[in-house]
C-alpha cells in the first residue's frame, strides 16, 4: 500500500483526500517511480474543479514529479531501477508516493539537479521552453509582455528572456511581486492593481506595442492583452487563472490589427520521447549554467495538498511550490 491524494467529486480544495491505495504494477512499456518531490501547478486546480474533466472519479491528481525508478516493465529500454528521473506530462496521479507512467513520459535527471528542483521546474520550465522557443521564437532586442510575471512560469520566463537578450515587461499585483520579477530579469513591471496595462505598454514601447503577449490569466486580461499586441502580432493564451475566455468574436482580431491567437499545450510540442528529452536538456543546461535559478518558496507535506491549493488559489504563493511525500 501507498499514500496518495484523490478526489471523488469536483469542487474546491476540500474535496482532496489523503488516502491509502494499491499502486499498479508497471505494464510492459511502463515505469513505476518512487516520488521524492511533486510539483504543484495551477492546472491541478482545473482538474480538481472540473474545468478540465478527469478520466473518471475517484481520480488522482497532479502530473509533475521527480524521483527514482523503482520497477520497470518487460519492454522498457531507456530506464533501469535506480535511475533518477523527472516527468511533467504523465497521467493524473503524481500526488502520490508511487506513480506509474509510460517510459516515453520520463526524462533522465542530471546529478547536478536535485529532486525538489526538478519537481519545481519540469512543467513550468518546459512550458517556458515551448512558449519562448517554439510557439514564438524570441529574438534578442524584442520587447514582450508576460502576465503574472511573479508566478511559477513567469519567474522562469523573466530569466529565460533575459538570457536571450529580450526585454520582458511583466504584469504583477503588488510592489513585492514587482521586485521579485525584476530580481529574476524582468526589464519593466506594471502593477495592474493601480496602473493601466495597455497605456503603460504603449509608453514603454514608444507606441509600437509587443510582437507577442503571453497570457495565463484568461478572462480578466483578454481585452487588455489584445490591446498590447502589435499589428500582425501574436497573443499566446496558455492558462485560465481568472476563468476561461468565452464568447470571442473573431472579428476583434482584424479590428485590433490582423492579430494571431494561439492556445498551445505542452503535449503538442513534447510529442515524442526525443523532443521531450531535448526540451528538458535545454532547460537543465540553463539551470546548470546559472541562467535560471529555481525559487521554491513553499513546501507542503503531501497530506497538506488541500492547504497548498487554498494558498495557490488565493495568490499567496510566489515562485514554485512542491509537495513532499
UniProtKB/Swiss-Prot annotation:
Keywords recorded for this protein, A-Z: NADP, Oxidoreductase
Any GO MF annotation of the entry: mRNA 3'-UTR AU-rich region binding
Q: Which InterPro entries match?
A: ADH-like_C, ADH-like_N, GroES-like_sf, NAD(P)-bd_dom_sf, PKS_ER, QOR-like, Quin_OxRdtase/zeta-crystal_CS
> One Pfam family of this protein, by short name?
ADH_zinc_N
Q: Does the keyword tRNA processing apply?
A: no
Q: Which Gene3D superfamilies match?
A: Medium-chain alcohol dehydrogenases, catalytic domain, NAD(P)-binding Rossmann-like Domain
Q: Which residues form a coiled coil?
A: none
EC number assigned by the record: 1.6.5.5
Cysteines engaged in disulfide bonds, as pairs: none
Q: Which CDD domains match?
A: QOR2 (cd05286)
**Gene Ontology, cellular component aspect:** cytosol
The question of whether Oxidoreductase is a record keyword is answered with yes
Membership in a protein family: Belongs to the zinc-containing alcohol dehydrogenase family. Quinone oxidoreductase subfamily.
Which PANTHER family does the record match to this protein?
A: QUINONE OXIDOREDUCTASE PIG3-RELATED (PTHR48106), QUINONE OXIDOREDUCTASE-RELATED (PTHR48106:SF13)
Q: What is this protein called?
A: Quinone oxidoreductase
Organism of provenance: Pseudomonas aeruginosa (strain ATCC 15692 / DSM 22644 / CIP 104116 / JCM 14847 / LMG 12228 / 1C / PRS 101 / PAO1)
Q: Which gene encodes it?
A: qor
Amino acid at each position: 500500500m501507498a499514500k496518495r491524494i484523490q478526489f471523488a467529486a469536483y469542487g474546491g480544495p476540500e474535496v482532496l483526500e489523503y488516502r491509502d491505495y494499491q499502486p499498479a504494477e508497471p505494464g510492459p512499456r511502463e515505469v513505476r517511480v518512487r516520488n521524492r518531490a511533486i510539483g504543484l501547478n495551477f492546472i491541478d486546480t482545473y482538474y480538481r474543479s472540473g474545468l478540465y474533466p478527469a478520466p473518471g472519479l475517484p481520480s488522482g491528481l497532479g502530473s509533475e514529479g521527480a524521483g527514482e525508478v523503482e520497477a520497470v516493465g518487460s519492454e522498457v529500454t531507456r530506464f533501469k531501477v535506480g535511475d533518477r528521473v523527472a516527468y511533467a506530462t504523465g497521467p493524473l496521479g503524481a500526488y502520490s508516493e508511487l506513480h506509474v507512467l509510460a517510459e516515453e513520459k520520463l526524462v533522465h535527471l542530471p546529478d547536478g539537479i536535485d529532486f525538489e528542483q526538478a519537481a519545481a521546474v519540469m512543467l513550468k520550465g518546459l512550458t517556458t521552453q515551448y512558449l519562448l522557443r517554439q510557439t514564438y521564437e524570441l529574438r534578442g532586442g524584442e520587447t514582450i509582455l508576460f502576465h503574472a510575471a511573479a508566478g511559477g512560469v513567469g519567474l522562469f520566463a523573466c530569466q529565460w528572456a533575459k538570457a536571450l537578450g529580450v526585454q520582458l515587461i511583466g504584469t504583477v499585483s503588488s510592489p513585492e511581486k514587482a521586485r521579485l520579477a525584476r530580481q529574476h530579469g524582468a526589464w519593466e513591471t506594471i502593477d495592474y492593481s493601480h496602473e493601466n496595462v495597455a497605456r503603460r505598454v504603449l509608453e514603454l514601447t514608444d507606441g509600437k506595442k509587443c510582437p507577442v503577449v503571453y497570457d495565463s490569466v484568461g478572462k480578466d486580461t483578454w481585452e487588455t492583452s489584445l490591446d498590447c499586441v502589435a499589428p500582425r502580432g501574436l497573443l499566446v493564451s496558455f492558462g485560465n487563472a481568472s476563468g476561461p475566455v468565452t464568447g470571442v468574436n473573431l472579428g476583434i482580431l482584424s479590428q485590433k490589427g490582423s492579430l494571431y491567437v494561439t492556445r498551445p499545450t505542452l503535449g503538442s510540442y513534447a510529442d515524442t520521447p526525443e523532443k521531450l528529452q531535448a526540451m528538458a536538456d535545454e532547460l537543465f543546461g540553463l539551470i546548470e549554467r546559472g541562467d535560471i535559478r529555481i525559487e521554491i518558496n513553499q513546501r507542503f507535506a503531501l497530506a497538506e495538498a488541500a492547504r497548498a491549493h487554498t494558498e495557490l488559489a488565493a495568490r499567496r504563493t510566489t515562485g514554485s511550490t512542491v509537495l513532499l511525500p
